[in-house]
Amino acid sequence: MARDFPLERVRNIGIAAHIDAGKTTTTERILFYSGVVHKIGEVHDGAAVTDWMAQERERGITITAAAISTSWQDHRINIIDTPGHVDFTIEVERSMRVLDGVIAVFCAVGGVQPQSETVWRQADRYSVPRMVFVNKMDRTGADFLKVNNQIKDRLKANALPIQLPIGAEGDLTGIIDLVANKAYLYKNDLGTDIQEAPIPSEMDDEAAEWRYKLMESVAENDEELIETFLETGELSEEQLKKGIREGVLKHGLVPVLCGSAFKNKGVQLVLDAVVDYLPAPVDVKPIQGVLPSGKEDVRPSDDNAPFSALAFKVMSDPYGKLTFVRMYSGVLSKGSYVMNSTKDAKERISRLVILKADEREEVDELRAGDLGAVLGLKNTTTGDTLCNTEDPIVLETLFIPEPVISVAVEPKTKGDMEKLSKALTALSEEDPTFRVSTDPETNQTVIAGMGELHLEILVDRMLREFKVEANIGAPQVSYRETIRSSSKGEGKYARQTGGKGQYGHVIIEMEPAEVGKGFEFVNKIVGGAVPKEYIGPASNGMKETCESGVLAGYPLIDVKVTLVDGSFHDVDSSEMAFKIAGSMAFKDGVKKCNPVLLEPMMKVEVESPDDFLGSVIGDLSSRRGQVEGQSVDDGLSKVQAKVPLAEMFGYATQLRSMTQGRGIFSMEFANYEEVPRNVAEAIITKNQGNS
């Protein structure tokens, strides 16, 4: 089957920003103007096409990353609309991993918010080229150039306006295109009657000044263009487009556009800019991976290269399990067998679909650069690589943050027990930041996630989709344990109870691993001191012990274990004996490695009238918070701080009381840090008292 669009004319883009910047409305308008939908859906009406889960339509927020295909100017545009709420950061993370370009949406009034910085960092992590749409220019207090300066100052981006608004707030009547050097005036409310016109005379000087800055910045990134610019003082529209595109692809420029998606102004120009400036799959670096030999390799965006794809999302719906994939190379055909190289398992491709939010179009194949979904995969989860059996490769995977908050959950009736188990399995397959465990002391099921809203939504889904009624406990902080020094550990398990005995013996070296590595295992056995068939069980014994820690029963993270020696018995050794020996060696080693307790630290931003600044800072300090920055603008103070999550329960009520109901705050996970000794001792004592 031939391609609908050449690879050069494909754009895989994401629309990302902080909550309430207008991402979903922008996506809706893109779908309306590109002909995918024929009626405009609003988030606040619960009618947005990309918000298709019941909770999304009720709450007016986007929870999951919805993938949609559309076309514009003979280009295929695959769009992922991502959530802005920090509790759903994994949805943004997995989208960034598979995208080629991003439209970052900012509110013209609110500007750069804490979540904007998080999204920007996620795009930086995967080197995703981006452009900016300053939305809500119709709102009172809208200030395009102020937001542009915030992007430069707070995000350290080379933000470059390629448009200027004509008017603002209630008088937004059009947009100046600095590249084409002309104006677009909006003549109807639907945004479909647009008149090209000369730049209004009262804005001539301002437009000329900003166009000169644009030409100067573009020329600086291109030797050929700088010569032309120095000689003539001018660049043509074609030269500017070429220069901006090259600047975006090299991460040297971020073009900034403006408009109001809600008022139907500026969205078609955003689509034009996606086509003109954001990369095709062939414009970005080939994806890197590791061959079975351990050697690094790359896969180019090419239909003729060996097939490789990354599963970036798994969803259960009434039709079965959907696995979203980003095709990096080759062709994937319906009915074929492929390899899950991450799990070393074979998979059959029963059906392939391209999605338009909650509608789907069946296709016979997916090709390099496509975003699509596979039905019928049995073993594949988020972050797994799919590839040809003849050309195995494991692609770079996703960064998955540790959960920070947990609650106990129990079914209301015995009849709900099995349904709860099925629901939790399905939800944890979909969402890698959602973890399920059993408390060994109380035997309660414990679920952990990225925040209270995250867990609230998941519990809501259990009731709606899986018909499970459950009682939920009070939220608890998800502490972690780690080690600070290196040591050796030894575990010998020998039992003789008549007949065949049990024997396993391992010696390990243990040291702190890089942050984010979790549990890292290295086998350095030589000369068969431990036979190959017992190395896996020994490693599994250690990994399982990791889950319950040694200080207070919390999972142990960022530990590197090297298996260096051991011994075995020809008759008495078994997999179980080596699993137990591995666990014993691990516990022995951890105790000697200065184990410490870690707690989730939250990045908190508080806004309040400046009269309350002293009270806000004093209160944050009393919560073991570290104030990292503060500012006062027009009588409004902003305080940025890092505060332990354990100290933030009940903060909303306290802030309202302190600021007479005029303070607001946002909070997101920052990192795990060591708990101060006196606090750690109290937590450890409490947990040991409960056991």
UniProtKB/Swiss-Prot annotation:
Keywords: Cytoplasm, Elongation factor, GTP-binding, Nucleotide-binding, Protein biosynthesis. GO terms for molecular function: GTP binding; GTPase activity; translation elongation factor activity. SMART domains: EFG_C (SM00838), EFG_IV (SM00889). InterPro entries: EFG_II (IPR041095), EFG_III (IPR009022), EFG_III/V (IPR035647), EFG_IV (IPR047872), EFG_V (IPR035649), EFG_V-like (IPR000640), EFTu-like_2 (IPR004161), G_TR_CS (IPR031157). Gene3D superfamilies: 3.30.230.10, 3.30.70.240, Elongation Factor G (Translational Gtpase), domain 3, P-loop containing nucleotide triphosphate hydrolases, Translation factors. GO terms for biological process: ribosome disassembly. PROSITE patterns: G_TR_1 (PS00301), G_TR_2 (PS51722). One of its GO terms (cellular component) is cytoplasm. It holds the Pfam family EFG_IV. It is found in: Cytoplasm. GTP binds at residues 17-24, 81-85, 135-138. Its main location: cytoplasm. Residues 8-282 form the tr-type G domain. Catalyzes the GTP-dependent ribosomal translocation step during translation elongation. During this step, the ribosome changes from the pre-translocational (PRE) to the post-translocational (POST) state as the newly formed A-site-bound peptidyl-tRNA and P-site-bound deacylated tRNA move to the P and E sites, respectively. Catalyzes the coordinated movement of the two tRNA molecules, the mRNA and conformational changes in the ribosome. Belongs to the TRAFAC class translation factor GTPase superfamily. Classic translation factor GTPase family. EF-G/EF-2 subfamily. This is Elongation factor G. It comes from Prochlorococcus marinus (strain MIT 9312). The lineage of its organism: Bacteria, Bacillati, Cyanobacteriota, Cyanophyceae, Synechococcales.
